[in-house]
């Protein structure tokens, strides 16, 4: 539960105005604090923090219908997890002389509001729960496969195979340009157990001189080369359906940098509410399919990391050329490529906040898992 940094006495200057603004926001109001003049008696022990109040105002602005009283209450009492400021008092309301200075809520950076929003969204995730496991009778006559490699491409492939054709069988390791695979690993981690921020995560692997295990294609293939059914590395996307024994594959869904960052932050809070394995299941099976599509491109490898990625890709290509197992496609296909897209901003805080607000006011977001 949130506690404001400064709890004014009921009769202190500005307190009645502040409680009037709280009542205004609870009833769907959108007037900024600086323009508010009405008063009301105290409706609680302490005033909500400026972050919580401003987030509620933004939700009211975005909503097509009044928010439910429950959602408004949850926003006003939500904690602001992660690194950042404690709950802040409103400027113009007398309070404690200690602690952070009071603020005009409209001037708060987007990141401060995202902290509150992720707390509410994480509670939603736990309450929604997991969807039902897909069922299907096994097909003993059908070829079964296991899938590894690029985690976003592998997720799409598993979806195309379905539970009846996944299991013991040949391991299909799916590769792509290494810069794309790195972006896909980080993005998928955001929708599983969480991760460090994108650039911090890249620096971690560069400093270690290693690749994340899921996209170290040669290491993955060598682990499974002697297993029943063997292994094949597929680098040609046009050959992947044949390798999996399907007619076609749906296009892989790559969330934008804003969606991945919001998921990363939600995962951090979900991890405080449920055990690690349950968090991974909730993030990958509940949040992943429900996350709205945005116009922002996925994260991309910045110029300062491109030399390291290029060298790692060249090394991987040489290893694949000498491989003692089938490789479908040109090993040079793992070389990093420039997408030509405008890269996503390093800190897409404003877009992350916009997405969080969009989700919180969408009734479909909180529909029970099916």
Describe the residue ranges of each PLM region.
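Anion-recognition interface
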Residues: 1-370
